[in-house]
Amino acid sequence: AIARTIPFMDAVEPAQEVRHMLLDLIHAAEEFIYIENQFASREEIAEALNQQLKRKPQLKVLVVSSYEPKGTMECEAYWAGRIDFKNIVENGVRPDRIRITHSSAQPGSGDAALKRIHSKLMTIDDRYLVIGSSNFSNRSMTLDTECDLIFAADSEPQRAAIAHLRNDLLAEHTSLSIAQVERILQQAQCIDGLLQAKSNNQYHLSE
């Protein structure tokens, strides 16, 4: 399926399909949501994630985002929104079930190398894959023109393909193998396991 965001413009019918699609998929999640997005600042999405975490005790959410915004305006907009998003989504939820993270590598000396995330992707329980142009930000949901693709798995091979894509991305961010990521995700404390997997001079996840 395709979901669009079309802002209010003269002689153009507006659309907020992306916003509604994201909320619907979050409310359908039961086990694991993986989000990879340049921005994580839309409070409505944070509230939906928090509500679903409280409704589904087995659900876990892992967000991988950028940690080093570029330019004065991006910095000002980014940090306030990220802090609010984090506070909302974590409210009343055990910390081992939700993490807002970034990927970085620490060389032997010098500053950490922070990976700049520009992708916009979400997986839901190996059942849904969303990939497109939409950031999890107020601007992207209302003012920009966006288009996202939604893939729904209706067979085991399709579910396996979505899981493989997610695990491949996590392997890149943690410097683990795909097989190692798969084993960690089967553990009860899987998010903590991914954050604790650190190697010298290689990329790993941190809060």
Task: Annotate each PLM feature.
Residues 1-207:
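Charged, low-complexity intrinsically disordered terminal segments
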